[in-house]
């Protein structure tokens, strides 16, 4: 993880803003630039005349940020400051005014009260003063109106503290920003992503990253109320994501976030109107990162948004030598394989005598698959361990693709190495039951929450990849995005017409009987 820091420090008075970039290389800290403000004091009222160098202006609209560098900051005409008067009471200023209308780096604030001490404390915050404790609200819902635009910084929770020093007839100070900032810079070479727009970004943590915070005299933020572990950044009509390299003008997205070390789940919400068989689809591409968010720092997080593609050539009859549409796959020169619904008059399906066809068994009883690709699958006992002890979690929104179309929905299971007691020899709750010899349906309700962020590497994902059905449905492609079906290596022992398969959908993971003539997924489990 690479962090590069740019400090904008004043030589006399001004605003401190640190920019931190996060990519994937080494680290470096460099480059100082100056900014300054001056402040004029009058007994019984105080006028703050904020002055900044034009190339490095101060304050609450953050702009001109570049990846790996800091940013420029200017005042808004709605900005106010808090100043502690001679009696130790916080006073809120009037809104900013600008001596030169076109120069937003220069602002004047007027504050009622008496100010004659050598120093006075100054606070900038988005929250009006209630009582004697300055607070800031880091918003759990933030809105960005255009790409690479951080006009909402002040409204979303930017804050700062300073000690105003009396110099002659003026008070001068350097404002230190005490919230942290994240800048998300996505790119993609994936066709489905490039056909989409980013409509919002969810940033989630295992600890609070938003809420109402008390601002200590040194600027330390302490959660007071309304803690939220998620920040949602909305992007209006959406940002394009058709850039293969980082292009901040396309989609750089900013949020204010509480300082501290956070392990984040960042879910980019995409709207795609071109690639789902049923019409527009809204779903997520998810990234994970752990960072230490330094107060006053902009952390650049780049991301290559990709979507897992499941090729479509691993649908099989149970224990068949070849896939359901062998030689005529959807992407072959002579495709028979339906990628959507097949017409009912079609006769293109696995026929007796072909490698894609499995004859019916002649008798019931225990039977394990003979083909190598089926022998590599979990047997019935192992699949029961995944169901009952694998902590299944439903994921409604993660996007995936197959056979030229975009879908969403699937389930997370713990990997075998993370399931205590995992064995291939017996039922997880009954050591005397071997499901290869005794048929038992096994089911468990799936959690509707995603797994814990810091434990995601213990899980693997199965998409709701549908199946090819027989009988009255006449070999149609069914339920993609709604249900997933995965073969085991074990036949059902109680009859000659069934085999064990995993079925997963929104609320349930189940090990149960399926017809061997159906085309279900064959894939090894982790």
Regions found by a protein language model. Name each.
Residues 2-388, 394-396, 400:
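Sec-type signal peptide cleavage vicinity
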């Amino acid at each position: 993880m690479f962090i590069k820091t740019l400090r904008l420090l004043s030589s006399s008075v001004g605003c401190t803003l640190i920019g931190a970039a996060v990519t994937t290389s080494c680290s470096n800290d460099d480059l100082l630039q100056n900014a300054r403000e001056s402040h004029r004091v009058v007994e019984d009222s105080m006028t703050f005349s904020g002055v900044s160098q034009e190339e490095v202006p101060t304050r609450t609209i953050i702009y001109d940020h570049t990846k790996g560098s800091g940013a420029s900051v200017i005042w808004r005409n709605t900005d106010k400051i808090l100043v502690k008067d001679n009696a130790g009471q916080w006073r809120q200023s009037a809104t900013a005014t600008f001596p030169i209308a076109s120069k937003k780096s220069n602002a004047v604030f007027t504050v009622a009260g008496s100010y004659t001490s050598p120093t006075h404390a100054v606070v900038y915050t988005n929250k009006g003063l209630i009582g004697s404790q300055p607070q800031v609200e880091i918003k759990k819902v933030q809105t960005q109106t255009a790409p690479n635009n951080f006009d909402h910084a002040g409204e979303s929770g930017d804050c700062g503290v300073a000690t105003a020093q009396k110099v002659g007839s003026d008070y001068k100070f350097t404002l230190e920003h005490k919230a942290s900032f994240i800048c998300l810079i996505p790119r993609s070479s994936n066709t489905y992503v490039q056909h989409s727009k980013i409509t919002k970004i969810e940033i989630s943590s295992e600890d609070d990253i938003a809420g109402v915070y008390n601002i200590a005299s040194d600027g330390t933020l302490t959660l007071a109320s309304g803690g939220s572990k998620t920040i949602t950044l909305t992007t209006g009509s959406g940002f394009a994501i058709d850039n293969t390299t980082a292009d901040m003008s396309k989609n750089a997205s900013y949020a204010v976030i509480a300082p501290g070390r956070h392990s984040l789940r960042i879910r980019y919400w995409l709207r795609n109107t071109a690639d789902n068989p049923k019409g527009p689809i809204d779903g997520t591409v998810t990234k994970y990162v752990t960072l230490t968010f330094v107060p006053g720092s902009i952390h650049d997080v780049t991301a290559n948004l990709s979507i897992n593609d499941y090729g479509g050539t691993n649908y099989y009859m149970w224990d068949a030598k070849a896939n359901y549409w062998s030689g005529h796959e959807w992407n072959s020169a002579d495709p028979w394989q339906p990628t959507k619904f097949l017409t009912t008059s079609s006769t293109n399906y696995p026929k007796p005598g072909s490698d894609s066809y499995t004859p019916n068994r002649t008798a019931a009883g225990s039977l394990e698959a003979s083909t190598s690709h089926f022998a590599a699958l979990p047997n019935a006992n192992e699949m029961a361990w995944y169901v009952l002890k694998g902590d299944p979690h439903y994921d409604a929104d993660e996007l995936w693709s197959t056979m030229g179309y975009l879908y969403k929905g699937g389930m997370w299971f713990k990997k075998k190495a993370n399931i205590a007691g995992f064995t291939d020899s017996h039922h997880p709750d009954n050591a005397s039951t071997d499901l290869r010899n005794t048929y038992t349906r096994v089911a468990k309700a799936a959690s509707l929450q995603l797994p814990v962020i810091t434990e995601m590497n213990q899980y693997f994902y199965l998409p709701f990849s549908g199946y090819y059905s027989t009988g009255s449905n006449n070999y149609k492609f069914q339920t993609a995005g709604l249900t997933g079906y995965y073969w085991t290596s074990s036949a059902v022992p109680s009859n000659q017409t069934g085999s064990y398969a995993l079925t997963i959908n929104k609320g349930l993971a189940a090990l149960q009987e399926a017809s061997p003539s159906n085309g279900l997924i064959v894939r090894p489990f982790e």
